[in-house]
Amino acid sequence: MNTIHYNETVQLQPCVATIGFFDGVHRGHQFLIRHLVETASQENLQSTIITFDEHPRKVLQSDYQPEMLSTLDSKLLLLSKTEVDNAVVLHFDKAMAAMSACEFMQKILHDHLHVRKLFIGYDHRFGHNRSETFGDYVRYGKELGIEVIKNDAFRIDDINISSSVIRSFLKEGEIELSLIHISEPTRPY
């Protein structure tokens, strides 16, 4: 896996991508990553995960200190054990937070990362104040030549697996439950 710390000179080969913080690279993330890799292979494109160096809420709410499931280095190590071609790390700051979803898709996803298909997690939102919807992303994507696809939730025992759910299990002392949701016993990632 190529790890790329994004700047305005970065130019990737056309790719299928997904975007998110990927804290813990848990089973929900792994489910999304498998779809990403399979689709990229079928389309003969590179697979790319776009993530951030800082949790967006930490930047936007200076008093927010999330208990993270992984550091950036450990997240990249976990991602390197998947079949993903590229991991692009964006520096999340106030300037990026001020970008609309349309501007983000144009300047970063289209102009520099050359995204052809974008997988979005079932609960993921991006752009200034996260005010835009999946329908907006689809509309912007059509204008830019990016197909936007919403990935279904990965569920175990009627629970949508997310980093927040795993954090709550850990907080409640449910170590075994959190481990079940973090990784599959038969997979190294």
Model-derived regions: residue spans:
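N-terminal catalytic cores of NTP/NDP-binding nucleotidyl/phosphoryl-transfer enzymes
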Residues: E8-T71
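Extended, well-folded interaction surfaces typified by the phenylalanyl-tRNA synthetase beta subunit core
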Residues: I161-I166, E174
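N-terminal Rossmann-like or analogous alpha/beta NTP/dinucleotide-binding catalytic cores
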Residues: K58-L144
